[in-house]
């Protein structure tokens, strides 16, 4: 059974504090939007899908007990709070897309004269709650498409049928499992599906400095699931791909541009470069909500920069020389030219096919 990072019932939201893992498993109550903003900004919850879900559910928790004098007042409240939540971690596009969708719903309901303010609030709460189930279903589809893509490529290289390929070794970066989503995971969902098919020989996870999401969170999930797994340092990836016959790299995404350029956790870009050099397929696993067709390329993606302390300290212990300057971008952008395929809940697309394919899917 996968870990549960988000616990929700109407009027109540608790999140697993990921800053305390793996030493302590503690749930933190999110009582409203201010709490939601803080747990997202402080990275007590992280992962683009989970950020969107927790952000929107924090708004649902806040408005649930409130009574509004009019639909217009409710709509104003929704708009202001959603805009505030988007500012917590601006690189992750899922929160912005979810906010836009919920605001569009609020606008439509405000104009609908057949619905009163109580009905509008109920419809809004239902829409936010539906995000949980949809995210899990989308992740399971991503896992299935991704596993089949990796196995197909391995089989083709060996001149065999897809069903006879494997077991395979894969590498992942950062944390993209149940802790980063509502459940199952994106890139780690691909790993999970390979394991369920009996096709996972081994999974390697990077430590993912400076926040150590791989060492703290992915390793925690892999041990929990009892998958055959090994933790490696970020600086070991080239040696790993040269020595260990890795069949594919699969990572998540915080934002994918229309041309396929992908913003993901810092260190992803260099892994893609190394994978290209060694001829190892490099896949990005992301729901459609992580794809931003309004951004033409990676140069237009805003990259969040984090505090120096995340580099200079581990817990309360300083590990860097006092007085040294730091540069701490949370993400980097992997060029589309280094990406083999982008795995979504609707299939796997080459970066150059992405814009046209996603546009057609959204129009259908």
Swiss-Prot record:
One of its GO terms (molecular function) is S-methyl-5-thioribose-1-phosphate isomerase activity. The keyword Isomerase applies. Transmembrane segments: none annotated. Disulfide bonds: none annotated. The record marks 174 as: Transition state stabilizer. The active site is at 254 (proton donor). It catalyses: 5-(methylsulfanyl)-alpha-D-ribose 1-phosphate = 5-(methylsulfanyl)-D-ribulose 1-phosphate. It is an enzyme of class 5 (isomerase). GO terms for biological process: L-methionine salvage from methylthioadenosine. It is found in: Cytoplasm; Nucleus. Catalyzes the interconversion of methylthioribose-1-phosphate (MTR-1-P) into methylthioribulose-1-phosphate (MTRu-1-P). This is Methylthioribose-1-phosphate isomerase. It comes from Drosophila ananassae (Fruit fly).
